[in-house]
Amino acid sequence: MVQEIAQEIIRSARKKGTQDIYFVPKLDAYELHMRVGDERCKIGSYDFEKFAAVISHFKFVAGMNVGEKRRSQLGSCDYAYDHKIASLRLSTVGDYRGHESLVIRLLHDEEQDLHFWFQDIEELGKQYRQRGLYLFAGPVGSGKTTLMHELSKSLFKGQQVMSIEDPVEIKQDDMLQLQLNEAIGLTYENLIKLSLRHRPDLLIIGEIRDSETARAVVRASLTGATVFSTIHAKSIRGVYERLLELGVSEEELAVVLQGVCYQRLIGGGGIVDFASRDYQEHQAAKWNEQIDQLLKDGHITSLQAETEKISYS
């Protein structure tokens, strides 16, 4: 019974294109929520003991400590259902009552349709003509990885393309994909060094996480390859400021940084802001105009519009 419930949850989530599944403990029940794009929807409330058992089932499959319900844990697994496999990342933590919550991130290893409100892939691709470093920023689930893979197919067809990811999210036969495994020394730093020996035309680096990775990404860009990577920031200006915080100099950025793309999924589609220079002075007028248009066309509410606008103070 527990396994059947778990499989039905994953089946339903995959059908909806869900990025995240939330098991939220309440006083005497569990609430189940799913996030699709920028919307987090409540699916229902369920028997507490039954869904606590479902959480234990997922933890067991992911190799986590089933008996530990207070401390946070991370896990991952390839979950089998209906003769299919779903790649999952799990995170658990207990609240003050010792009731455990679970978040499951679904890695959709097949390509997802990426719909933009005001641009298409061909139009966006015109911004990526020069060799060097291109950075993609935006929240989790905003389509950064999908956009990087779409651009790699349209701009680097038949060329040497490599990726370094943690984990590999979209499996591609037309590129060499490497996956982090720090336990055996496969760190971002080491894999970047290894990949450069293969002389890639495009190197996709999953995420700039720290100063070490930032320095390695800059060095890779200086070899003449085109490099795509993601970074956590809330705007184009924020990307530039984050790189400086990580120890990359303005002189280095002037040489290697060819473009910054900031994107979000809003109202069921993506919107993009792009800059190829003057990152520190970038204005949010184009972004805010797109938000205003979505509001005018009835795709978002006035509250959403107010929340999604960017203001540089």
UniProtKB/Swiss-Prot annotation:
<dbReference type="InterPro" id="IPR027417">
    <property type="entry name" value="P-loop_NTPase"/>
</dbReference>
<dbReference type="InterPro" id="IPR047667">
    <property type="entry name" value="ATPase_ComGA"/>
</dbReference>
<dbReference type="InterPro" id="IPR001482">
    <property type="entry name" value="T2SS/T4SS_dom"/>
</dbReference>
<keyword id="KW-1003">Cell membrane</keyword>
<dbReference type="Pfam" id="PF00437">
    <property type="entry name" value="T2SSE"/>
</dbReference>
<dbReference type="GO" id="GO:0005524">
    <property type="term" value="F:ATP binding"/>
</dbReference>
<dbReference type="GO" id="GO:0005886">
    <property type="term" value="C:plasma membrane"/>
</dbReference>
<dbReference type="GO" id="GO:0016887">
    <property type="term" value="F:ATP hydrolysis activity"/>
</dbReference>
<keyword id="KW-0472">Membrane</keyword>
<feature type="binding site">
    <location>
        <begin position="138"/>
        <end position="145"/>
    </location>
    <ligand>
        <name>ATP</name>
    </ligand>
</feature>
<keyword id="KW-0067">ATP-binding</keyword>
<keyword id="KW-0547">Nucleotide-binding</keyword>
<comment type="similarity">
    <text>Belongs to the GSP E family.</text>
</comment>
<dbReference type="InterPro" id="IPR003593">
    <property type="entry name" value="AAA+_ATPase"/>
</dbReference>
<comment type="function">
    <text>Required for uptake of DNA by competent cells. May be involved in assembly of a complex forming a transformation pilus at the surface of competent cells.</text>
</comment>
<protein>
    <recommendedName>
        <fullName>Competence protein ComGA</fullName>
    </recommendedName>
</protein>
